[in-house]
């Protein structure tokens, strides 16, 4: 069902905070490592954004698509997904220590972490805290990653914790080069994210 995977994507999109730096990286590709480090440091300073876009999800037995709204304010998030014709609407809000998932016509669910909520509701174990980094074009910190740089010293692809992420295009907003279209491939799950509107902000701590 689309709703099942809509909830899955919402939970994948959760975060463990925007601070942190220094993932263990293996670099390859055509980019310049020094330029990559400067690009990475700039993007790591982003601790606020608003994203509007579309998400497509494909699994072995079903698939679906919907719209995405993601508001990030340091460690607080408000993520909303809506399926075609309003079906499968879900909203996830919270910060480290408390997560609330509201699903249209189904109910309200709470957990201490996005990982716990995902396992409780769907029985799946996924690196749900990584997408806050991946959506900015960064590897998640404190986890080994294999990175391929493009000619502009930005990520062309990354492999991390059993997931492969492809960066198909970037867009420049407020001096930041940010992913515009990306594909995520995990075990039995493929996700395509197209960002229509990026509003990055550096809020400070």
Curated annotation (Swiss-Prot):
Membrane topology: Lipid-anchor
Annotated GO CC locations: cell outer membrane
Lipidation (N-palmitoyl cysteine): 18
PROSITE patterns reported for this sequence: PROKAR_LIPOPROTEIN
Signal peptide (from-to): 1-17
Source organism superkingdom: Bacteria
Stored SUPFAM superfamilies: Prokaryotic lipoproteins and lipoprotein localization factors
InterPro entries: LolA/LolB/LppX, OM_lipoprot_LolB
Major location category of this protein: membrane
Lipid tethering residues (S-diacylglycerol cysteine): 18
Keywords annotated in UniProt: Cell outer membrane, Chaperone, Lipoprotein, Membrane, Palmitate, Protein transport, Signal, Transport
Subcellular location: Cell outer membrane
GO biological process terms, semicolon-separated: lipoprotein localization to outer membrane; protein transport
Subunit and interaction comment: Monomer.
Summary of the function given for this chain in its UniProt record: Plays a critical role in the incorporation of lipoproteins in the outer membrane after they are released by the LolA protein.
Record family assignment: Belongs to the LolB family.
NCBIfam families in the cross-refs: lolB
HAMAP family on file: LolB
Protein name: Outer-membrane lipoprotein LolB
Organism (species): Pseudomonas putida (strain W619)
């Amino acid at each position: 069902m689309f709703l099942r995977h809509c909830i899955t994507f919402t939970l994948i999109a959760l975060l463990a905070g925007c601070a942190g730096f220094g993932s263990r990286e293996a670099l390859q590709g055509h980019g310049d490592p020094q330029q990559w480090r400067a690009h990475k440091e700039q993007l790591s300073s982003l601790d606020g954004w608003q994203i509007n876009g579309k998400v497509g999800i494909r699994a072995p037995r079903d698939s679906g698509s919907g719209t995405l709204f993601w508001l990030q304010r340091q460690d607080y998030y408000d993520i909303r997904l809506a399926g075609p014709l309003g079906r499968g609407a879900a909203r996830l809000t919270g910060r480290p220590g408390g997560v609330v998932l509201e699903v249209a016509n189904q109910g309200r669910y709470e957990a201490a972490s996005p990982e716990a909520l995902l396992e409780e509701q769907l029985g799946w174990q996924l690196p749900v805290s990584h997408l806050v980094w991946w959506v900015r074009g960064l590897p998640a910190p404190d986890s080994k990653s294999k990175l391929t740089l493009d000619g502009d010293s930005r990520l062309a692809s990354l492999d991390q914790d059993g997931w492969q992420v492809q960066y198909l295009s970037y867009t420049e907003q407020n001096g930041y080069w940010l992913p515009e279209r990306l594909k995520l491939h995990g075990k039995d799950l493929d996700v395509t994210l197209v960002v229509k509107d990026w509003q990055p902000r550096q809020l400070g701590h």
